[in-house]
């Protein structure tokens, strides 16, 4: 029951709304026709806001007169026209100018707003293109400047690196040169000392040989380089001299791979031989101490 009532109310409202809409539309129709009807006695061109051809021709003539040189104008002014022909001349000029007015001028007057908008759009595009070209040129200049600065920085770093390498090379060459000079000086000093040792008398040589042998016996284990420095000899000369003394039986011992000579006395050799023959016997304590020193 309630549903039927609601449906009836909705239908009634719909009928009222449609009726009001139709009445409003009917009242608005005469007003639209009256507004659309052209005004009597007023030219269509005037109603549309389009200027008359005479006005257009007059404007065109004024523009042409502004472009005419002053001399022809003065010559024309010197011959005044007849008074009776002035009106006909004006009308003829109006008609002639109207005939000479290009159709584009009329269209410009009719489409002034559209053309102005179009020209403004073109001008805006032109300005935009010029701005883009300007920005592009500025960007190219900036990139070229950055590239030049980067290349300059790379050249500077390369120059610094080259100077550093040259300095290291010169320092190395100087160090090697000094080492070579010191080596030559040392070599010359050894040569002089060797010559002085070899050119000494027999007594001095015998004394030096005795001191050499006694030095080995006292130290048991001697470093060959230290022995060479002590007696102002070369290391190879020390080795040769020890081998000669071993060959004639003056001293006994061994030269190890560490550049040392280990002296072994006759008593120690006998003790070693006895320990080898007797397994229960222990070797002399002085031998291992001397061997491991």
Curated annotation (Swiss-Prot):
Gene giving rise to this polypeptide: Ddrgk1
Cytoplasmic side: 24-293
Function: Substrate adapter for ufmylation, the covalent attachment of the ubiquitin-like modifier UFM1 to substrate proteins. Required for ufmylation of Atg9; protects the nervous system during aging, possibly by stabilizing Atg9 and supporting its function.
Membership in a protein family: Belongs to the DDRGK1 family.
Record's compositionally biased regions (Basic and acidic residues): 107-158
Metal-binding keyword on record: no
GO cellular component, as recorded: endoplasmic reticulum membrane
MF term (GO), any: ubiquitin-like protein ligase binding
InterPro entries for this protein: DDRGK_dom-contain, DDRGK_domain-containing, WH-like_DNA-bd_sf, WH_DNA-bd_sf
Assembly behavior: Interacts with Atg9; the interaction is transient.
Name of the protein: DDRGK domain-containing protein 1
One GO BP: protein ufmylation
Database matches in SMART domains: DDRGK
PANTHER family for the chain: DDRGK DOMAIN-CONTAINING PROTEIN 1
Protein's cellular compartments: Endoplasmic reticulum membrane
Listed transmembrane segments: 3-23
Membrane topology note: Single-pass membrane protein
Low complexity bias: start-end ranges: 52-84
Entry superkingdom: Eukaryota
Topology feature Lumenal, residues: 1-2
Species for this entry: Drosophila simulans (Fruit fly)
UniProt keyword annotations, A-Z: Endoplasmic reticulum, Membrane, Transmembrane, Transmembrane helix, Ubl conjugation pathway
Main location: endoplasmic reticulum
Region span, Disordered: 30-158
Biased composition (Acidic residues): 87-96
Keyword Transmembrane helix part of the UniProt annotation: yes
